[in-house]
Design a protein with these regions (language model features):
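Short hydrophobic/aromatic beta-strand or adjacent loop that forms the aromatic wall/cage
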Residues: 9, 106-108, 162-164
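Short, charged, solvent-exposed linker or helix-capping segments at domain edges/interfaces
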Residues: 68-70, 77, 121-123, 176-180
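Catalytic core of Fe(II)/2-oxoglutarate
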Residues: 124-182
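Secondary-structure boundary elements
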Residues: 76-77, 114-117, 172-174
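Non-heme Fe(II)/2-oxoglutarate
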Residues: 1-81
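Short beta-strand-to-loop capping motifs
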Residues: 16-18, 113, 167-171
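A general structural signal for short secondary-structure junctions and capping/turn motifs
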Residues: 1-5, 74-77, 99-103, 135-137, ...
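Catalytic core of non-heme Fe(II) oxygenases with the double-stranded beta-helix
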Residues: 80-150
Length: 182
């Protein structure tokens, strides 16, 4: 069943088959995400957690082509997004990707490879107070569009690697991107 909720996220019916091993998907390290934002610091007042470090990698031209072929050409005519691979592993029961907004993209399409039953949480942040407003649990091989301008986090399963291919839109907002995926 496809799920669509307010302006945070939308599941879409897109599938990608990756040939070869997951090790072949990634290439050069693009970025390590470990900076704390005010949203995560606010949640830390109420929830004891450790921030996991997520790493994004560049992908091969073959993977880029395969992923971009799943995006409507009309959307690609507006913006050619950056394609990347992310992996993060929780070290213990308190590990999470803390609440954050993505500072360099405003929308992403995530092609989930391994999710371990982990849930993505969305928050409202106002006057230093953070409150959960929505969440979704993606399964392996599902595709979701996320509004990355709204604070979000992921509670990680210990010693399990979360993996996905992502597509970053730097200029095209969530509302416009989802309009191409009815």
């Amino acid at each position: 069943m496809l799920y669509d909720m307010n302006n945070c996220f939308k599941q879409i019916d897109v599938k990608i088959k990756f040939n070869g091993s997951l090790a072949d998907i990634k290439s050069d390290l693009h970025m390590s995400h470990s900076k704390w934002q005010k949203y995560g610091l606010s949640l830390k007042r109420d929830v004891d957690y450790d921030a996991a470090i997520a790493n994004t990698f560049e992908v091969s031209d073959e993977i880029k082509s395969e992923v971009l072929s799943t995006i409507p050409i009309e959307l690609l005519n507006i913006e050619i997004p950056h394609v990347w691979y992310l992996e993060v592993t929780g070290s213990d029961d308190t590990s999470m990707i803390p609440p954050h907004i993505d500072s360099f993209r405003i929308c992403t399409i995530n092609y989930y490879i391994n999710t371990n039953g982990e849930t993505t949480h969305y928050y409202k942040y106002e006057s230093g107070v953070i409150k959960e407003i929505d969440s979704f649990c993606s399964n392996d091989n599902e595709c979701w569009i996320l509004n990355t301008t709204i604070p979000h986090s992921v509670k990680l399963v210990p010693n399990k690697k979360r993996q996905m291919i992502g597509v970053s839109f730097l200029n095209t907002p969530f509302e416009k991107v989802i309009s191409f995926f009815p």
